[in-house]
Amino acid sequence: MTGLRIILVSPLADGWAVICAGLEPLVFRSGARAEAQAKRLAACLAKLGRAVQVRIHDRARNLVGTQLYPAV
């Protein structure tokens, strides 16, 4: 998949980060809120013609979920 943009939801010492190349990291206290924001961001980018994959990591930094948002 050429041009696939990756959005990571990753743990921090005191919260969760949403990380996407070209954007400032977003920080949340709740993992659920970080995941929800990552999915909203992915949906917006997909509507703008960019394929996006959201990757969710747990506190141990294991990959626990992915979701693909194809370009619209």
Language model features by range: what are they?
Residues 24-25, 63:
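Short, solvent-exposed loop/turn motifs
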Residues 26-29, 57:
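Intrinsically disordered, low-complexity proline/glycine-rich segments
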Residues 29-47:
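A short, charged, amphipathic alpha-helix used as a generic interaction element across diverse proteins
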Residues 1-24:
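Short aromatic-glycine-(Arg/Gly/Cys) micro-motifs in beta-strand/loop hairpins
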Residues 47-72:
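Short, mixed-charge low-complexity intrinsically disordered segments
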Residues 21, 30-31, 68:
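Surface loops and adjacent helix of pleckstrin homology
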